[in-house]
Amino acid sequence: MVEYYEVLGVQRNASADDIKKAYRRLALKWHPDKNPDNKDEAERRFKEVAEAYEVLSDSKKRDIYDKYGKEGLTNRGGGSHFDEAPFQFGFTFRSPDDVFRDFFGGRDPFSFDLFADDPFDDFFGRSRHRANRSRPAGGGGGPFLSTFGGFPAFGPSFSPFDSGFSSSFGSFGGHGGHGGFTSFSSSSFGGSEMGNFRSVSTSTKVVNGRRVTTKRIVENGQERVEVEEDGQLKSLTVNGKEQLLRLDNK
């Protein structure tokens, strides 16, 4: 039986932040698109990691799991002690792809993984130590990703508060056999002393004939992520919270 704490590689007393960091690392490592030569195992591990995160990141589900195990969530234990569990009709796990998509707020994490880390992580107090991790062998993602594998975020001397920084990259091949053109661009203006820092990053790729563009805007501590499909806004998140979209015609 799968043990969720072991799946994420955390202790039973792990904090919510530890669980989130573990999921981020393992979901990126085992995403099937990153493991085209080991897809069966990757899909299994990716699903296990998603299940573990979905349970352990929710205090209520985690408490039930700690007391009754997975059977307490799926209501398959058969014993009377499960009758008191809040999930009387069994908890249904979401698709691992949905968990992955929700976790990253609609943006494409592989666009930022070109540099082995998200260059904007430091805005929200997260450590950049992951930038120096070596990329796993056979990680997929095409020759462009291999070219930049292990490359620190914009170079060791780059500061996210440098004034007027901009860059753009592009490649053919896509991620894990999706095909199509993938591009990434980033620009930043202002500085930490000016108090009006603004950064805009955009990634565009063609998936199944549709052009998907993800724009991330970070300004004065606020993060806004817009996802467009063929020019139509499909999702909008502000500081990780999904916003309702108005359907008014412009």
From Swiss-Prot:
Q: Which Pfam families match?
A: DnaJ
Q: Name the GO terms of the biological process aspect.
A: chaperone-mediated protein folding
**Where is the protein situated, by its record's location annotation?**
Cytoplasm, Perinuclear region; Nucleus
Q: Where is the J domain?
A: 3-69
A single GO CC term for this protein reads: nucleus
Does Cytoplasm show up as a keyword for this record? yes
Fetch the CDD domains from UniProt.
DnaJ
Taxonomy, superkingdom: Eukaryota
- Return the Gene3D superfamilies for the record: DnaJ domain
| Keyword annotations of the record | Chaperone, Cytoplasm, Nucleus
Q: Which InterPro entries match?
A: DnaJ_domain, DnaJ_domain_CS, DNJB2/6-like, J_dom_sf
- GO terms for MF: Hsp70 protein binding; unfolded protein binding
Q: What PROSITE patterns does the record point to? A: DNAJ_1, DNAJ_2
Its function? Has a stimulatory effect on the ATPase activity of HSP70 in a dose-dependent and time-dependent manner and hence acts as a co-chaperone of HSP70. Plays an indispensable role in the organization of KRT8/KRT18 filaments. Acts as an endogenous molecular chaperone for neuronal proteins including huntingtin. Suppresses aggregation and toxicity of polyglutamine-containing, aggregation-prone proteins. Also reduces cellular toxicity and caspase-3 activity.
**Oligomeric and partner information:** Homooligomer.
Q: What is this protein called?
A: DnaJ homolog subfamily B member 6-A
Task: Name the species this protein comes from.
Answer: Xenopus laevis (African clawed frog)
